[in-house]
Amino acid sequence: MEEFERRRHFETLAATPQALKAAIRGLSKKTLVFTPAPGKWSILEILCHMRDMERDAYLARYRRILAEDEPRLPDLNGEALAIERNYRNAKAAEVVREWLALRRENLQMLRKTGRAQWARAGVHETAGRLTMEDIIRRHAVGNDEAHLGQIEAIKRRFGILERLAAAPAALAAALKGVPDDVLRRRPEAGKWSMIENAAHARDLERVYQGRFSRMAFGERPAFWMLENDRMAEALKYASADPADVVKEFRRLREDTIALLRALPHETWKKTGLHPTKGELTVEQLAARLADHDEGHIGKIRILRG
């Protein structure tokens, strides 16, 4: 490894404390404990894992390699540690304080490591022979960059699901107490009324459920272009009952959220071909659905006045 590479990895390790504090600043307890997919860790559990790896993996390995000749380096079972150390009930602020202290200790040790010492090595029980250079690369890229990326992905997913969960109540509030004639009045020719916008949101939920399922269980499915005005006429949006629309939208949205929550982590990266937007991941399509909700509920609020 060239000197500039070691320096780059060291700089990554030195920058992570500020990056991590920024990533979790202001997060609610609900966000911290949200699990993005079955069997996947929450942000809180990732923080606990980072703390324990900082101490029991990286700090311990650096120390042993610098002090001993080719020491044996045990593997650590992260899943077992999460259960044994009760990550789910940890206090995030305490965990981060402990991690910061450990990171400072690691940085101090690495600053003092001489050029010849970077070639010293230990023998990992599953990965084989690892030099100090190998370990700092794993520390910076496989640990810091990977876990910061996971935290950002969880925040995005949580935000999307929260937006989706909020839509039924927002739609109900936008329609509540509106006189029937106002509810069904079109603002101008070719523009939908309040009830037509609401019924469209309800029926697009079924379309999106189908798209999510096809993406989850297929390979890059292509989606058809919708003819929204023809749907509105065929399904009689103009005469829909607002209470029924809200009730059905709420039921369908609960099913959509249950479907998305049940998807394995990697499935959120699977793609489909949108007729106008091109290739989209499940995550991107879910964000578009939240945008779609907010767009039509916004139109209803404008029409309500």
Regions found by a protein language model. Give the residues of each.
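Short-chain dehydrogenase/reductase
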Residues: 47
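Aromatic-glycine hotspot motif
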Residues: 1-44, 55-305
